[in-house]
Amino acid sequence: MENKTASDYNDLPLKAPKLKGILLILFLVLLDQGTKYFAIRYLRGTSGITLIDSVLNLRYLENRGMAFGLLQNKILFLVLICIVFFMAIIYLFIKTPATFYYRPLLYTAAIVFAGAMGNFIDRVFRGYVVDFIYFSLIDFPTFNVADIYVTCGITVMVFLMFFRYKEENDFDFLKPGNRSAR
């Protein structure tokens, strides 16, 4: 019986990881849009819903900018930023080797893409992003489910780059002409 090393497992091909990533994106975007539909239907025009007194509230907000209220009413600029961001994530998704080693990167990229897509849909079809989750305990800016995807996804990507993909050649696959780093 042959002993397998960690490197052997890292090089194992994944079964349809990009299809799974696309399905994950679709599911997460639908979940985000469903929660925004709830916010529009049940929170707009009300004072909101208190889930945990003095801690967590649901309240309707139309955000015409980006995170923390930056770039208010600059929709064309925000749409262009999103398109560039989508192109970068798609490039990463296409070029990343479909191996066990890169599975966390592929799925994290899908989560970030889903969050950006959820807010992009709002900007294009509504002219604003629907936000509705408010932590009153710390007076944190109101946000939505897509924001959670982007924030958590980027955080995980940073950790991956510092702790998993720290070898010099781990991202060689992104260089022009290279097919795979491993």
Go through each PLM region and give its residues.
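Alpha-helical transmembrane bundles and membrane-interface segments of multipass inner-membrane proteins
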Residues: 1-182
